[in-house]
C-alpha cells in the first residue's frame, strides 16, 4: 500500500457493507457510524473467596460492573454518559431515515419486537450506541458459591458525527471516575487492592 499510495488516492470510498433491505430494494446510504471498542474490568479480592464467609464483606466485582454498566446506558438505548449526546438529526434526516428502511422487515427476521427506543430502524441507527458485547465473571461450568477476583465487560460504541474515538474515551473515563472508581491500566497490585475500596 505504501509503495503504490499514488495509485490508490481517491476522492470517494464506497463500502459494500450494511444490512440488506428485506424488500430487495437497492440502497445507497450516505454516512456511516464509526466504531470504538473498549474493555472495563472491576476488581475485588486478590483471590476467589467463599460467598458464605465473605458475602457483604468482599467487594463483588460482578455486582459493581453491573451497576457501572447500568450507569452508562438507559433502557431505551440512550448513552447516559455526560457529554455523549450527539447533535439531534434534522427533521429532514429523520424523515429520510424513517422512509429509507423497512423497519418491520428489519425487525421481523431476527425476531425483534421493537427497537429499544421505539423509533424506526433508520432513526435508531442514527443515534450513538453503547453495546455490551461480552461479559466475563467466574468460570465455565456449574455455578459456584464464590466471589471472584474480577469481572470484565467488552463494549463497542457506534459513533456519530462529532464524537471521535478519543473524545469517547475521555468521556467514558470521566464517567467511570465520577462513579467512584479508580482507573488503572494493569491489574491492581496487592497494595492497591488493600487501599482502594
Locate each region found by the language model.
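Acidic/histidine-rich catalytic neighborhood of metal-dependent amide-processing enzymes
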Residues: 1-31
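Flexible glycine-/small-residue-enriched beta->alpha junction loops
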Residues: 27-41
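Metal-dependent amide/peptide-bond hydrolase catalytic core
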Residues: 37-197
Amino acid at each position: 500500500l505504501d509503495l503504490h499510495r499514488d495509485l490508490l488516492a481517491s476522492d470517494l470510498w464506497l463500502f459494500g457493507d450494511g444490512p440488506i433491505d428485506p424488500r430487495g430494494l437497492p440502497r445507497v446510504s450516505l454516512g456511516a457510524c464509526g466504531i470504538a471498542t473498549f474493555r472495563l474490568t472491576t476488581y475485588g479480592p486478590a483471590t476467589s473467596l467463599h460467598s458464605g464467609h465473605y458475602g457483604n464483606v468482599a467487594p463483588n466485582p460482578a455486582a459493581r460492573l453491573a451497576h457501572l454498566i447500568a450507569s452508562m446506558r438507559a433502557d431505551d438505548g440512550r448513552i447516559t454518559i455526560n457529554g455523549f449526546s450527539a447533535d439531534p438529526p434534522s427533521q429532514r434526516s429523520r424523515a429520510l431515515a424513517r422512509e429509507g428502511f423497512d423497519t418491520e422487515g428489519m425487525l421481523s427476521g431476527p425476531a425483534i419486537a421493537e427497537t429499544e427506543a421505539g423509533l424506526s430502524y433508520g432513526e435508531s441507527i442514527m443515534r450513538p450506541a453503547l453495546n455490551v458485547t461480552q461479559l466475563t465473571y467466574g468460570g465455565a461450568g456449574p455455578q459456584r458459591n464464590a466471589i471472584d477476583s474480577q469481572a470484565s465487560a467488552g463494549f463497542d460504541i457506534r459513533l456519530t458525527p462529532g464524537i471521535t474515538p478519543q473524545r469517547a474515551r475521555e468521556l467514558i473515563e470521566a464517567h467511570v471516575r465520577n462513579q467512584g472508581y479508580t482507573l488503572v491500566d494493569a491489574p491492581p497490585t496487592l497494595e492497591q487492592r488493600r487501599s482502594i475500596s
